[in-house]
UniProtKB/Swiss-Prot annotation:
One GO CC annotation: cytosol
Keyword terms of this UniProt record: Amino-acid biosynthesis, Histidine biosynthesis, Hydrolase, Methionine biosynthesis, Multifunctional enzyme, NADP, One-carbon metabolism, Oxidoreductase, Purine biosynthesis
GO MF annotations in UniProt: methenyltetrahydrofolate cyclohydrolase activity; methylenetetrahydrofolate dehydrogenase (NADP+) activity
Assembly mode: Homodimer.
Keyword Amino-acid biosynthesis: yes
Protein name (Swiss-Prot/TrEMBL): Bifunctional protein FolD
Coiled-coil residue windows: none
Length: 295
């Protein structure tokens, strides 16, 4: 069994990007600039945005945190989005989800300039991804593809079962794994919470990518020998013996499944760290695209 180490791989990627930023600086170019829009003060969102800003600083990007009150109206937020779209100093930005209930998330995501949509959620980028054109790929699926590539996991002709159909992970993964190339060229089954007899699918899978958010539901008797398992699930489970009062669990019963797997991601330290690294990679791509356009 080989561990797909997202922590180490994400650090490698950050170092590669940092070296490229140094080259851009040395040539007198403009370094990438990423902004994060945070509405309200949701604890998890604050932590996540904070780690994105910190990562930007570590690799030499410019970064801006746009902090807005929970009470902001939809129209005011749309006006801010328009402002960011028109800001020539900015290469890409993300709007941290979830947004307050009185704001229509779809309307906000649609208002983002696709050329600055480094989260890859705009329908234009999603469509370009499906058509195998250059696009911003959502950071978590992008990170999974990068792990598979760097660890040389064979995907061509393999049966991949994706569990979960969200537009953030499941659906893009089903598209990416079936695209031409490596990783890719896989036969994909997309399953979800309404799928009957899920184990019948997982038992026949060469690769399982699970993003359901149900702690440790994937057991050893649901997988075959030699399977590759990518665990995207992150759930806080109460644990009085832990100083924090909780532990982070993935969708996979790691202890049991790892004994049968050829490759497996841990939780934490697997897919999670890759997400921020690939957001930075998308931002670097946005800078290059803008530089090419301005020549």
């Amino acid at each position: 069994m080989q561990l797909l180490d997202g922590k180490k791989t994400s650090n490698d990627i950050k170092n590669e990007i940092a070296a490229e930023v140094q080259s851009i600086k040395a040539a007198g170019g403009k370094v990438p600039h990423l902004a994060a829009v945070l509405v309200g003060n949701n604890g998890a969102s604050l932590t996540y945005v904070g780690s994105k800003v910190k990562s930007c600083q570590e690799i030499g990007f410019d970064s801006t945190l746009v902090s807005l009150p929970e009470t902001i109206t939809e129209d005011e937020l749309l006006a801010k989005i328009k402002e960011l779209n028109e800001d020539d100093n900015l290469d890409g930005y993300i709007v941290q989800l979830p947004l307050p209930k009185h704001i229509d998330e779809q309307k906000i995501l649609l208002a983002i300039d696709p050329d600055k949509d480094v989260d890859g959620f705009h329908p234009t980028n999603f469509g370009r991804m499906a058509l195998e054109m250059e696009s911003f790929i959502p950071a978590t699926p992008f990170g999974i593809m990068e792990l598979l590539e760097r660890y040389k996991v064979e995907t061509a002709g393999k049966h991949t079962v994706v569990i979960g159909r969200s537009h953030i992970v499941g659906r893009p993964m089903s598209i990416l794994m079936s695209r031409k190339g490596n990783p890719g060229d896989s036969t994909v089954t997309l399953t979800h919470s309404r799928t009957k007899d899920l184990a019948e699918f997982t038992k026949n899978a060469d690769i399982i990518i699970t993003a359901l958010g149900v702690p440790e539901f994937l057991k050893a008797d649901m997988v075959k020998e030699g399977v590759t398992v990518i665990d995207v699930g992150i759930t806080r489970v109460e644990d009085a013996s832990n100083a924090k009062g909780y532990v982070i669990k993935g969708d996979v019963d790691f202890e049991g499944v790892s004994k049968k797997a050829s490759f497996i991601t841990p939780v934490p330290g697997g897919v999670g760290p890759m997400t921020i690294a690939m957001l930075l990679k998308n931002t670097l791509l946005a800078r290059k695209m803008r530089s090419a356009k301005n020549k």
